[in-house]
């Protein structure tokens, strides 16, 4: 390829990107199904650093959950509705925990949760590695972390 052709292609790239963003930002939206029980599985992780919500996390010693990339609806995950007071209530063999969404699991299917190590340990021994057959649901939590029942879905827009 010649340099002049590359320059012309690159000059048009910002316009093409803007058009794609405008098309993607249209009617595309996804609702977080708050208070809708789902069946699935859980694994655990113990990474530390910045979570998808833009805050420092330590999955080795904090109670939190990473949910599937499929539930995230904004280009900037820091602004995603999942980071605005959404938790996951998980029940397995008579034990229930409620943990805040703080991270994204890029390899998880939409019914697969990646719990922090201490959250997983409250439900099953770490040596088990995977919990199959659990039930879980998104819940809205208040400022003090308490679960607040709501019936309306929380909606966010998607790009692409």
What are the residue ranges of the model-derived segments?
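Secreted/periplasmic proteins
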Residues: 2-14, 19-160
């Amino acid at each position: 390829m010649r340099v002049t052709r590359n320059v012309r292609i690159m000059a048009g790239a910002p316009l093409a990107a803007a058009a794609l963003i405008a098309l993607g930002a249209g009617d595309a939206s996804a609702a977080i199904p708050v208070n809708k029980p789902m069946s699935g599985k859980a694994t655990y992780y113990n990474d530390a650093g910045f979570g998808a919500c833009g805050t420092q996390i330590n999955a080795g010693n904090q109670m939190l959950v990473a949910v599937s990339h499929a539930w995230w609806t904004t280009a900037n995950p820091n602004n995603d509705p999942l980071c605005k007071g959404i938790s996951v209530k998980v029940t397995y063999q008579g034990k229930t925990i409620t943990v805040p969404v703080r991270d994204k699991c890029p390899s998880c299917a939409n019914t697969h949760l990646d719990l922090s190590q201490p959250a997983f340990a409250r439900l099953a021994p770490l040596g088990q590695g995977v919990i199959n057959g659990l039930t879980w649901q998104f819940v809205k939590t208040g400022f003090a972390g308490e679960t607040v029942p709501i019936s309306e879905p929380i909606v966010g827009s998607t790009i692409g």
